[in-house]
Amino acid sequence: MLCFLRGMAFVPFLLVTWSSAAFIISYVVAVLSGHVNPFLPYISDTGTTPPESGIFGFMINFSAFLGAATMYTRYKIVQKQNQTCYFSTPVFNLVSLVLGLVGCFGMGIVANFQELAVPVVHDGGALLAFVCGVVYTLLQSIISYKSCPQWNSLSTCHIRMVISAVSCAAVIPMIVCASLISITKLEWNPREKDYVYHVVSAICEWTVAFGFIFYFLTFIQDFQSVTLRISTEINGDI
């Protein structure tokens, strides 16, 4: 049986595949339409101009929903594990969830407010998504170590921490270099003064984005043992 069909494993699997498709499809359409330079555009650049803006907005909105669903399920898993065998304060898990949901909210802002139309709002959403997302992965990595070896293998903990560390190392120069760019534009010339800042921040942005994707990929095994039950109760007369 396919691993992503067991339990709730389809949730992080769908998040990973859908988000990857969102980035790749938007990039391909934007490049083929001649709206961006094929060499290292910002992720948001590939979702600014129609028709790719519609594709980007729709797919990133759904990615934000899947991200929230994955994080909430992860929160409930850790909560249940902690009740069975105490390894961490519940507040730590709750803070991680709140930061993760704030990051998903930031993704929604990025999806619905294009960078050239409302750059301040768009950039604010991107900052929320990336910073809160990186902190979320760091906190979840710490939780993973605390629950090892009862609930996680040491290799899984190491993988999560490496991804978190790389994402953390990339998000700082991404923000710094992006803040040094004096103008927001889609096409860049290597001779322009801010071109180096653009390239560095774009590399870091793609690194962090796919760092998130690979991180959620590690959740699939944890979600295989989770079952979702929905109960319906009708109160009062109809």
Swiss-Prot record:
Q: Does the keyword Flavoprotein apply?
A: no
- Top-rank taxon: Eukaryota
Q: What induces it?
A: By p53/TP53 and p73/TP73. Directly activated by p53/TP53. Significantly down-regulated in tumor cell lines by methylation-dependent transcriptional silencing.
Membrane topology term reads:
Multi-pass membrane protein
Which ranges does the record mark as transmembrane?
Answer: 9-29, 53-73, 91-111, 116-136, 161-181, 200-220
Give its localization. Lysosome membrane
User: Any idea which UniProt keywords this protein has?
Assistant: Apoptosis, Autophagy, Lysosome, Membrane, Transmembrane, Transmembrane helix
Name a single GO cellular component: lysosome
Query: Is Membrane set as a keyword in this record?
Result: yes
Q: In Gene Ontology terms, what is a biological process of this protein?
A: regulation of autophagy
Main subcellular localization, coarse class? membrane
Query: What does the function comment of this entry state?
Result: Lysosomal modulator of autophagy that plays a central role in p53/TP53-mediated apoptosis. Not involved in p73/TP73-mediated autophagy.
Q: What is this protein called?
A: DNA damage-regulated autophagy modulator protein 1
What is the originating organism of this protein? Answer: Homo sapiens
